[in-house]
């Protein structure tokens, strides 16, 4: 018989603020540098992201994605920063949205942070995550006729791909 242990995660200040204001989320353990991590369901991303923008997280430093492994979920993440005048150590938080690999869809945050434009396109191009409402969602790195999502861990690389002449 094995014992399961559940680690109690200390909610950070942003998570506490979200809870006080009625936003559904789950606090995750902070990363190695102390950045607060928050798990958000795809349906609640836009209301929560809009609230965080109003709360002062005015800079999307990075948006990206990763694959948890074959048959497992894909993750779309958003690293937000509160940029204010004369601050040496701005407040940072990272949102994570876990998506099913068979239909990875989440609303685009482009309309909140314009910096998401090319970053969401790259996540689409490499992992196949559909960012609903994105104005230009198309491949950005791979050729338009490329089949599959190259950074997924279950991706099988084609044996041959013929480059087309530019002329």
UniProtKB/Swiss-Prot annotation:
Lineage: Bacteria, Bacillati, Cyanobacteriota, Cyanophyceae, Oscillatoriophycideae
Subcellular location: Cellular thylakoid membrane
Documented EC number(s): 7.1.1.-
GO MF annotation terms: NADH dehydrogenase (ubiquinone) activity; quinone binding
GO cellular component, one term: plasma membrane-derived thylakoid membrane
Catalytic activity: a plastoquinone + NADH + (n+1) H(+)(in) = a plastoquinol + NAD(+) + n H(+)(out); a plastoquinone + NADPH + (n+1) H(+)(in) = a plastoquinol + NADP(+) + n H(+)(out)
InterPro entries xrefs: NADH_DH_suC, NADH_quin_OxRdtase_su_C/D-like, NADH_UbQ_OxRdtase_30kDa_su, NADH_UbQ_OxRdtase_CS
Listed Pfam families: Complex1_30kDa
Function: NDH-1 shuttles electrons from an unknown electron donor, via FMN and iron-sulfur (Fe-S) centers, to quinones in the respiratory and/or the photosynthetic chain. The immediate electron acceptor for the enzyme in this species is believed to be plastoquinone. Couples the redox reaction to proton translocation, and thus conserves the redox energy in a proton gradient. Cyanobacterial NDH-1 also plays a role in inorganic carbon-concentration.
Keywords, comma-separated and alphabetical: Membrane, NAD, NADP, Plastoquinone, Quinone, Thylakoid, Translocase, Transport
Assembly description: NDH-1 can be composed of about 15 different subunits; different subcomplexes with different compositions have been identified which probably have different functions.
Disulfide bonds: none
Source organism, top-level taxon: Bacteria
Primary gene name: ndhJ
Name of the protein in question: NAD(P)H-quinone oxidoreductase subunit J
GO terms under biological process: photosynthesis, light reaction
Membrane topology: Peripheral membrane protein
């Amino acid at each position: 018989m094995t014992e399961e242990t559940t680690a109690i995660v200390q909610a950070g200040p942003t998570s506490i603020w979200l809870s006080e204001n009625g936003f559904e989320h789950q606090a995750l353990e902070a990363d190695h540098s102390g950045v607060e991590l928050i798990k958000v369901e795809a349906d609640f991303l836009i209301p929560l992201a809009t609230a965080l923008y109003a709360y002062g997280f005015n800079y999307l430093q990075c948006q990206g994605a990763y694959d948890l492994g074959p048959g497992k979920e894909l993750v779309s993440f958003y690293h937000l920063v509160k940029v204010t005048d004369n601050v040496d150590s701005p407040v940072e938080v990272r949102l994570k949205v876990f998506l099913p690999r068979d239909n990875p869809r989440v609303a685009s945050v482009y309309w909140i942070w314009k910096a998401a434009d090319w970053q969401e396109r790259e996540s689409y191009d490499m992992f196949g995550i559909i960012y609903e409402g994105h104005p230009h969602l198309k491949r950005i790195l791979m050729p338009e006729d490329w089949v599959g999502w190259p950074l997924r861990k279950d991706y099988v690389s084609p044996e041959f791909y013929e480059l087309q002449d530019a002329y």
